[in-house]
């Protein structure tokens, strides 16, 4: 008898929608585990359902995460509706806005690793089958995506959303739209006598009008856009603000999507391919996004076992134009991107130009090209997002540098440069505080190349962001006249002439450790070169006398971190 189509279909092995949770639900010996699960609400009929971890970085410390408790509830509704059983758990999150400019910032980047480790720990210990990962601020986004890549289960990422811009009423009677970055810059302006204290107060009270992540194309919004481009979040979900009820719909659909991924046997690494990372880099370059995206995409790729390097950023950045007129260098915020159609507008423009891979799989189960065809986003509006025929800059908004000062690499947000070359005289500081003191004393002047070292992943430790000093430099009116270089990082809200992630870092005997006041430093953005103009023999003599400083932390999480963390050039990953 010939085999029928239905018989053939029956012979095809379907994916197990409970690939792990059977370890805690099936068999006589699992009676104790089932008893525990009954206590949290599961009944007999629920033990046949896939168990979905709903991991959230919700807390009350920062507005970035305030909406996540509401969104997690909606995710669980979606999981239930699709036939799964959701189990919610929490992880940490650090507020960079609150931690900036003091000892607390040492603990920011390590929180990325703690988040990834903690999510992995719960998912592995409880044998959960899949996950929806919710995050709202800078390090929680990559931390969640690193966990997804490491676990390689059915996973969907969901962003909390951006804050709305505030409006400050200033002493001259004017009104000004502001974000949190304006507060850092106002401090520098006030210190130089360029702004009255009452205006600083007005800005302080206006910058955060409600819940959501910092509103420009800073680190959180950059990484949310990258997650959408990677295919790890639902199309169109990055741009709507945190207070927009469309987010509840995205949350419910994210819960449904993860169960469907289980049914189809699609896991995170099926989505997180080399081509998907290239798509994410292209979108970050076109938006002129945060330099932190370089660090984080390298780290996520490491967890996904994808070979990604700084050379990939250089290659893609050289052919993808900068299209978005968004803060910190531009005029618009993420809400404006949402108003003109969101991240799909950018992705469709890049796809049409052959700068995006449309065949990459996404959490919808469809490809990038299929998703965009279904959405049919409009063309760029010409103001918030430029057409490819009329870019802000012909190349991407981030440039990878190499040279005698950065043999392994460095990163600059070239979207903010008006000229390609800067040559200045080194003013060398061991740590950010000393540089801030010099700025406040008026001893940093036009033409200086301010070097802040021993702020790398190991030397900091924790690779602190330098928003306090960059904001103060801009506020003091020196943003276009002073070059800032560091083995640390910059906030996604940083503006000005800023080179970060210099590798090797000072504590690892990188060239930045041997700089002295008065050395000449040359930055050539067009040719992607960062050099110190000192005779090599002189530099070698300084190297032989080098002794690294002792570790700043002898106990606790940072003492462990220093022993494990690698170079910024490979994402500052541990292990």
From Swiss-Prot:
GO BP annotation list: isoleucine biosynthetic process; L-valine biosynthetic process
Pathway(s) annotated for this protein in UniProt: Amino-acid biosynthesis; L-isoleucine biosynthesis; L-isoleucine from 2-oxobutanoate: step 3/4; Amino-acid biosynthesis; L-valine biosynthesis; L-valine from pyruvate: step 3/4
Region described as Disordered: spans on this chain: 1-25
Cofactor note: Binds 1 [2Fe-2S] cluster per subunit. This cluster acts as a Lewis acid cofactor.
InterPro entries the record matches: DHAD_IlvD/Edd, Dihydro-acid_dehy_C, DihydroxyA_deHydtase, DiOHA_6PGluconate_deHydtase_CS, ILV_EDD_C, ILV_EDD_N, IlvD/EDD_N
Superkingdom in the source lineage: Bacteria
GO molecular function term, any single one: 2 iron, 2 sulfur cluster binding
Catalytic activity: (2R)-2,3-dihydroxy-3-methylbutanoate = 3-methyl-2-oxobutanoate + H2O; (2R,3R)-2,3-dihydroxy-3-methylpentanoate = (S)-3-methyl-2-oxopentanoate + H2O
Needed co-factor(s): [2Fe-2S] cluster; Mg(2+)
Residue sites binding [2Fe-2S] cluster per the record: 64, 137, 214
Residue sites binding Mg(2+) per the record: 96, 138-139, 465
N6-carboxylysine PTM positions: 139
Chain ranges passing through the membrane: none
Residues annotated as catalytic: 491 (proton acceptor)
Subunit structure: Homodimer.
NCBIfam families for the chain: ilvD, PRK00911.1
Protein name: Dihydroxy-acid dehydratase
Organism field: Mycobacterium avium (strain 104)
Gene (name only): ilvD
């Amino acid at each position: 008898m010939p085999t029928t189509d239905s018989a053939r279909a029956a012979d095809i092995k379907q994916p197990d929608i409970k690939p792990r949770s059977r370890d805690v639900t099936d068999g006589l010996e699992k009676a104790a585990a089932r008893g525990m699960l009954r206590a949290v609400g599961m009944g007999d009929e629920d033990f046949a359902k896939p168990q979905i971890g709903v991991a959230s970085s919700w807390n009350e410390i920062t507005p970035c995460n305030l909406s996540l408790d509401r969104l997690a509830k909606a995710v669980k509704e979606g999981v239930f509706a699709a036939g799964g059983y959701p189990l919610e758990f929490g992880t940490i999150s650090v507020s960079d806005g609150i931690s900036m400019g003091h000892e607390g910032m040492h603990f920011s980047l390590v929180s990325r690793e703690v988040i990834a480790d903690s999510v992995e720990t719960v998912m592995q210990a409880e044998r959960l089958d899949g996950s929806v990962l919710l995050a709202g601020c800078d390090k929680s986004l990559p931390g969640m995506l690193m966990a997804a890549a490491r676990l390689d289960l059915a996973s969907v990422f969901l962003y909390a959303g951006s804050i709305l811009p505030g409006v400050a009423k200033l002493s001259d009677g004017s009104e000004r739209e502001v974000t949190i970055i304006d507060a850092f810059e106002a401090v520098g302006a006030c210190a130089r006598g360029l702004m009255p204290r009452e205006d600083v107060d007005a800005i302080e009270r206006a910058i955060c009008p409600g819940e959501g992540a910092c509103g420009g194309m800073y680190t959180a919004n950059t990484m949310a856009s990258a997650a959408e481009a990677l295919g790890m979040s639902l199309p169109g979900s990055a741009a709507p603000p945190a207070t927009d009820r469309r987010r509840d719909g995205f949350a419910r659909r994210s819960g449904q999507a993860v169960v469907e991924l289980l049914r189809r046997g699609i896991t995170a690494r099926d989505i997180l391919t080399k081509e998907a990372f290239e798509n994410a880099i292209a979108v970050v370059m076109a938006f002129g996004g945060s330099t932190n995206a370089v660090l984080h995409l390298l780290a996520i790729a490491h967890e996904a076992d994808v070979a990604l390097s700084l050379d990939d950023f250089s290659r893609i950045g050289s052919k993808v134009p900068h299209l978005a007129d968004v803060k910190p260098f531009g005029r618009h915020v993420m809400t404006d991107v949402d108003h003109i159609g969101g991240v799909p507008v950018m992705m469709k423009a890049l796809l049409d130009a052959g700068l995006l891979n449309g065949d990459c799989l996404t959490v919808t189960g469809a490809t990038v090209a299929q998703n965009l065809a279904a959405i049919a986003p409009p063309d760029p509006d010409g103001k918030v997002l430029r057409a490819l025929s009329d870019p802000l800059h012909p190349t991407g908004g981030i440039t990878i540098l190499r040279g005698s000062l950065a043999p392994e690499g460095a990163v600059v947000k070239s979207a903010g440069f008006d000229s390609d070359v800067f040559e200045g005289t080194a003013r060398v500081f061991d740590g950010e505080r000393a540089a801030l003191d010099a700025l406040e004393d008026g001893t940093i002047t036009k033409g200086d190349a301010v070097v802040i070292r021993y702020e790398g992943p190991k030397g900091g430790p924790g690779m602190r962001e330098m928003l306090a000093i960059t904001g103060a430099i801009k506020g003091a009116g020196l943003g276009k006249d002073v070059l800032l270089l560091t083995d640390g990082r910059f906030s996604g809200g940083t503006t000005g002439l800023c080179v970060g992630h210099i590798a090797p870092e000072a504590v690892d005997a990188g060239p930045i450790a041997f700089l002295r006041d008065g050395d000449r430093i040359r930055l050539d953005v067009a040719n992607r070169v960062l050099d110190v103009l000192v005779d090599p023999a002189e530099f070698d003599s300084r190297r032989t006398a080098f002794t690294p400083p002792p570790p700043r932390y002898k106990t606790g999480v940072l003492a462990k971190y220093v022993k494990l963390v690698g170079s910024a050039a490979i994402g500052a990953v541990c292990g």
